[in-house]
C-alpha cells in the first residue's frame, strides 16, 4: 500500500484510531462470544445471569442454577437479512441445572434470539440498519455541593449516587448540625448523621469519635501543660472514686475542670482532640436523641414510616432494602472507583454496596470542606459524567427482563410440588418477558435510531454520537444552559463545535477524533509525555480529572530535532486555564491540533479561520451532502 503523503506542518505522532471501535468493542465485551463459556469474565450478559441466579423456591426445596450460555451464528448473512426484511440475530441457549431435593436435572433452555452486531457497528432489525447511540450521563459516586441559604450562609452537602438504588444526601443546616436525607421526595424526613452512623455499625460514641477525630488518654498533670486546652473534650462522663459525676460527656475542658480532676485524684481521662471550629460531629452526638444502636434504628424507622409502629427488626430490614442489598442497591464498579478516589479509600472494586467507612470518610471530608470553604464538585465536568455504551445499555435492559422472568419462575416453583416427576428447567422458564425487553430496546428506545446513510461521514458520525437524553438521562425541557455549554474538560474528548442547532443543542454531541472510553466509561484523550524537558513519543491516555493536575502544551509548540521546546515560554493549560508558562514546567503535550474536534469538524479546511457558528453549520451540513 503506497504511503500517505502529509502536507501538514506537523508530523502525525499517533495514527487515527478505529473510529467505530467504541461500538464494536462494547458489544463484544457484552456478549463475549470469542471466550470459552466456562472462562467468561463477570461482565455483560454473563454478569446479569450471575446476578439473578441461582434462584431458590420459597420452601427451599428447589434451586435453579445458571451454568453457561451460547449464541448460535445467524442463519442468514447481513445482506440477506436486509433483503428479506428480517433481523440479524443469533439464538441464545442457556444451560441450567435444576436441583430438586437430592436430584439434579440438566437442560438447555432457548431464551429466544438476540441481535448480533455487524462488522460496521450496526444492527439489522426487521431489515432496517439501526445504531445505538452512546449515552452521556451523571456518573455514580459521590458529589460535594454547596447551596446558599436565604440567610446568606453557604450550606455544604454531599450526595452518594449509586448505579441502581436510592440516593443519599447529607447536608449541614443553618445551626451547623449535619443531617441525612434518605428520601429525595420527602425532604422533611431527615435525621442527624450520628443517628444513621450508630445504626450502621458505629455503635458507641467512642467508636464514632475515634473514627472522626483523635482520642488521647491524658493525666491532669499533662493537661495543665497543654497549650490548646480548650481543644480537648471528654469522650464519656468522668466519675470520682466514690462514683460522683465530675464532668459530663462532650464537655470542653478549661483550667477549673482540670483542677477538679486533679483534686479528685483522677489518674487519667480519655479525651478527644478537636481543633477550634471542627466539633460538628460532636455537636450532633450531643443533640442526638438515640444513645444505642436500637434507639437509632427505631428513630430512623419512625421518620421513614411515620404511620407504622417502630421496631428494631423492621428498621434493619428497611435499611438493608435501601442500601445493603445487592439486588436493590448497586454502586457499580464505577461508583466504588469514584468513592475510593474521592475519599482516599482502598476498598476492592467488587465491594459494590455502601460500607460504614464510606459514610464516615465522606462526612469527614464534608466537615473539612465546611472549615476551609473548599472547592465543591462541578457536575458538568467530564470527571463527573461518563458514557454508557451499547453493551452497558443493553445489559441494563437484560437485567430488567431477567428480574421479570425471576418473578414468574418463583411463582411457578411455588405451584409445583417438589415430589412431582418430570420437573425440568424448561417447564419453569418462560422467556417471553426477557425477549420482550430486548425487542423493545432495539425497536422503541430513544437511543436506538435508524442509521443515517446519506454518506459515509453521516454514518460514521451517527456511530460516534453522544446523547445526554434517553432513559436515566436529561430531558430537553429541563436541561439548563450550563449542561449544554462547552466545558474546559471537553478538550480532546467531546467536539466543541459539532452539535445540532435547535432544542437539542449541547445535549447531543460528538466524540473528538482521538478520544476513547476507558473501562469505567470515562472519556480519555492522548498526550505525549515530556521527560526532562524532552517531548517523547510515549503516549498516555488521561481522563478529565487526571489531566487537570498537569501542565499541557499545545500541539503546535515549536520543537527542535531532539524534541526540546525552542521558546523559553510555552502556551499551556493547567486546571483548565491557558497561559504562557516556562518550558521547564511542561509535563505533557497534545498529540495533534485535530484532537480537539470531531471527524466532521476536522474535515473543514482552515478551521481556525472560521467563525464558531459557521463551523457548526459546516460540520452539520457535510453530513447532508449526497
Where are these regions (language model features)?
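Extended hydrophobic-aromatic, low-complexity segments
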Residues: 505-507, 519
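Conserved helicase core region in the C-terminal RecA-like lobe
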Residues: 494-501, 508
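Flexible, glycine/threonine-enriched loop-and-boundary segments that flank and lead into catalytic domains
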Residues: 105, 465-496
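N-terminal non-catalytic structural scaffold regions of very large proteins
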Residues: 1-467, 473, 512-626
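Short coil/turn connectors at secondary-structure junctions
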Residues: 120, 128, 491-492, 503
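Structural and coupling elements of P-loop NTPases
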Residues: 82, 501-504
Amino acid at each position: 500500500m503506497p504511503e500517505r503523503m502529509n502536507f501538514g506542518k506537523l508530523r502525525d505522532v499517533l495514527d487515527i484510531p478505529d473510529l467505530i471501535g467504541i461500538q464494536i468493542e462494547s458489544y463484544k465485551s457484552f456478549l463475549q462470544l470469542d471466550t470459552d463459556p466456562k472462562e467468561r469474565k463477570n461482565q455483560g450478559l454473563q454478569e446479569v445471569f450471575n446476578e439473578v441466579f441461582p434462584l431458590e423456591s420459597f420452601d427451599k426445596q428447589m434451586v435453579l442454577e445458571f451454568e453457561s450460555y451460547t449464541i448460535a451464528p445467524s442463519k442468514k448473512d447481513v445482506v440477506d437479512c436486509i433483503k428479506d426484511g428480517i433481523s440479524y440475530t443469533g439464538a441464545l441457549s442457556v444451560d441450567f441445572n435444576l436441583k430438586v431435593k437430592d436430584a439434579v436435572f440438566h437442560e438447555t433452555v432457548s431464551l429466544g434470539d438476540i441481535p448480533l452486531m455487524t462488522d460496521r457497528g450496526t444492527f439489522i432489525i426487521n431489515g432496517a440498519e439501526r445504531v445505538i447511540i452512546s449515552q452521556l450521563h451523571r456518573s455514580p459516586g459521590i458529589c460535594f455541593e454547596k447551596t446558599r441559604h436565604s440567610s446568606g450562609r453557604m450550606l455544604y452537602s454531599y450526595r452518594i449516587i449509586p448505579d441502581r438504588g436510592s440516593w443519599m444526601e447529607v447536608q449541614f443546616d443553618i445551626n451547623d448540625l449535619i443531617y441525612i436525607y434518605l428520601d429525595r421526595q420527602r425532604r422533611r424526613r431527615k435525621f442527624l448523621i450520628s443517628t444513621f452512623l450508630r445504626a450502621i455499625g458505629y455503635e458507641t460514641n467512642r467508636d464514632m469519635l475515634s473514627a472522626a477525630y483523635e482520642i488521647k488518654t491524658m493525666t491532669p498533670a499533662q493537661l495543665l501543660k497543654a497549650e490548646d486546652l480548650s481543644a480537648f473534650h471528654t469522650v464519656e462522663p468522668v466519675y470520682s472514686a466514690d462514683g460522683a459525676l465530675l464532668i459530663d460527656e462532650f464537655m470542653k475542658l478549661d483550667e477549673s475542670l482540670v483542677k477538679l480532676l486533679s483534686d479528685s485524684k483522677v489518674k487519667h481521662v480519655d479525651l478527644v482532640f478537636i481543633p477550634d471550629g471542627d466539633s460538628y460531629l460532636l455537636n450532633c452526638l450531643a443533640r442526638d436523641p438515640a444513645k444505642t444502636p436500637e434507639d437509632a434504628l427505631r428513630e430512623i424507622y419512625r421518620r421513614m414510616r411515620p404511620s407504622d409502629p417502630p421496631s428494631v427488626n423492621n428498621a434493619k430490614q428497611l435499611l438493608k432494602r435501601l442500601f445493603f442489598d445487592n439486588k436493590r442497591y448497586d454502586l457499580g464498579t464505577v461508583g466504588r472507583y469514584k468513592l475510593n478516589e474521592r475519599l482516599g479509600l482502598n476498598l476492592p472494586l467488587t465491594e459494590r454496596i455502601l460500607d460504614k467507612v464510606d459514610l464516615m470518610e465522606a462526612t469527614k471530608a464534608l466537615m473539612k470542606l465546611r472549615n476551609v470553604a473548599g472547592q465543591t464538585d462541578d457536575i458538568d465536568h467530564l470527571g463527573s459524567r461518563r458514557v454508557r455504551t451499547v453493551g452497558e445499555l443493553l445489559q441494563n435492559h437484560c437485567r430488567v427482563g431477567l428480574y421479570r422472568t425471576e418473578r414468574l419462575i418463583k411463582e411457578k416453583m411455588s405451584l409445583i410440588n417438589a415430589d412431582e416427576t418430570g420437573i425440568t428447567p424448561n417447564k419453569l422458564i418462560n422467556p417471553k418477558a426477557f425477549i420482550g425487553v430486548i425487542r423493545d430496546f432495539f425497536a422503541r428506545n430513544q437511543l436506538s435510531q435508524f442509521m443515517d446513510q446519506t454518506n459515509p461521514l453521516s454514518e460514521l458520525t451517527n456511530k460516534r454520537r453522544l446523547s445526554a437524553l434517553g432513559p436515566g438521562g436529561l430531558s430537553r425541557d429541563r436541561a439548563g444552559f450550563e449542561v449544554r455549554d462547552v466545558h474546559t474538560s471537553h478538550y480532546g474528548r467531546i467536539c466543541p463545535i459539532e452539535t445540532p442547532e435547535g432544542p437539542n443543542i449541547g445535549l447531543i454531541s460528538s466524540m473528538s477524533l482521538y478520544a476513547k472510553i476507558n473501562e469505567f466509561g470515562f472519556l480519555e484523550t492522548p498526550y505525549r509525555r515530556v521527560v526532562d524537558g524532552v517531548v517523547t513519543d510515549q503516549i498516555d491516555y488521561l481522563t478529565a480529572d487526571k489531566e487537570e493536575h498537569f501542565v499541557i502544551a499545545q500541539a503546535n509548540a515549536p520543537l527542535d530535532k531532539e524534541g526540546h521546546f525552542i521558546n523559553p515560554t510555552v502556551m499551556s493549560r493547567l486546571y483548565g486555564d491557558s497561559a504562557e508558562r516556562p518550558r521547564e514546567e511542561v509535563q505533557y503535550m497534545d498529540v495533534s491540533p485535530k484532537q480537539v474536534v470531531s471527524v466532521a469538524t476536522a474535515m473543514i479546511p482552515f478551521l481556525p479561520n472560521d467563525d464558531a457558528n459557521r463551523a457548526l453549520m459546516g460540520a452539520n451540513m457535510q453530513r447532508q451532502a449526497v
